[in-house]
Amino acid sequence: MRLLAVTALLLLSFAAPAHASSGCTVYNGACVQKHTNQAWLVTNGVTSYGPVRISHGKPGFGTPVGNFPVLRKVKNDWSVPYNGPMPNAVYFTTDGIAFHQGDLNSQTHGCVRLSWNDSEVFYNNLFPGERVQVLP
């Protein structure tokens, strides 16, 4: 039993922190790094998915930098202000900023766009109350 406990501690000590060089401090949730156009999921302080390519807010509609809670999820949402689909939306600000599927080759009105497959993974693995950290 003692050997099992020691082995488990050794394995945990070698687990890579969630992109430590990025400055992301999320323990459970997601990190976004705008200057590299990447995002990743974090579980128990370790990167569990990604990094993946993203698109984020264009000038005048910047994706806000900071720490936010996941607020809600909507499988097939529609943006009324921008008249467009928001599949796999995971909202993390009260003014409508979310992760969702969309074109990665153009900038957004503040949301974080993901590929179809990545948006499904983020949708299925982020939950209300978990954290999203957006880095410059």
Regions found by a protein language model. Give the residues of each.
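Secretory targeting and sorting signals
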Residues: 1-20
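Exported/periplasmic cell-wall-interacting domains
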Residues: 21-27, 58-67, 72-136
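A structural motif detector for short, solvent-exposed N-terminal "entry" segments of globular domains
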Residues: 21-58
